[in-house]
Amino acid sequence: MTNGRLRVLSLTYAFPPGVSSRFPSLNQAGHPNETRLAEALSRLAEVSTVGMLAREIFGKLEPRDDSIGLEHELLLWDRRPELWHRWHSWRQLRRFYLEKTARQGMPDVLLVKNLGPVYNCFVRWLRRQHPRPLIVLILADAGTLGQKIPFAKRLRFAFKPMITLDEGKSMLWFDACISYGIGTRCYFEPRGVPWMWMPSAFNFRYNPPPANFAQTGPIQFGYFGQLDERTSVLPMVQGFLDAHVPGTLHVCGYGKLSNVLKELAGRHSSFHFDGLLAKPSDCLAWAQKVDVLINPRLPIQGLDNSFPSKIFEFGMTGKAVLSTRTCGVDQVLGDEGIYLETKDFDNSLRQKLRAVAAMDRAELQRRGEAIRGRILRKFNWDEQARRIIEFLTGILKTRPAAGRPPAIHAA
């Protein structure tokens, strides 16, 4: 520690400042989450960051704009050919760590975002060093964890450089886990690995206009976020059309389903597709045209191992939220959320849409304001950073002085 503050080295995938707005399809939720978390942690600890960037950005860091990002001490690139660049990146990271440690001393904690090949390789090397920092996984997404992996996929990935497909085995490399997904607890605590649920927080502060209690007309629905099959956007749109409620559904975002949604909007007057907005933060002002935002996430394809970060931005709009409980969303929204059932989802969606469409607009406005207040109090990044530092400090107090935690074995 330095002056009583933890020294933290964080391995991230966040962009440098001024870059992200030119690459809206890359790291949509992860970048603002990682940036805001590092900023909040730096107010409580001495934080250094490393950034791993995608090949699409190489050579395109300029010109910069005013989009958020992190000033990394080291930039790494995941480029083709993968075998060479991943091997080179992990060697760069190891050299950076050794030089930084020799110059400034060993960090207390290494935070590692997800289970990427380069960071995995570095973690496996670091575990063999003595002494070493506490190695903590920040698990935002784990698509294969708890899933049966087909033999063909195992065979295909066996030839991909530095890839560890079995995420369950990779968990054993870490001394603790900070997880976005509430369902990952069972992979850590039975093995004696400290685990903390931290579903993230809101990234864009927004003050919605005062509620218009004189507004009349049908209840309007909306969705913003990723547009792919995993997010269940198409079943949501189809369920809305089948419900035949008097209002309209508005959608904006980016993803593979954009063209499909555009075509649907052309055929149905009650469905409007607004495409990709200029900046993620623009979605909050866009949402003022609706009364209720819908989160249709289902516990499929490993999504229950993560958290839909758009829930926090939904909350900041001051609008009511209709959502499944998947990933612990109900623990964030509380009693003011309106909930869908994941079993028999299609029928539940139609019934809830009809019920919400019949609700008094003032009641929906009250719910939205209550959700916003709850998120501002309990799910801001400063509060999450405080919880993380408390979690890490508690582990370090029980850690052997030599810096090597007790061995962790598979259950």
At which residue positions do the language-model features occur?
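An aromatic- and histidine-rich active-site surface loop
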Residues: 56, 90-93, 110-131, 137-146, ...
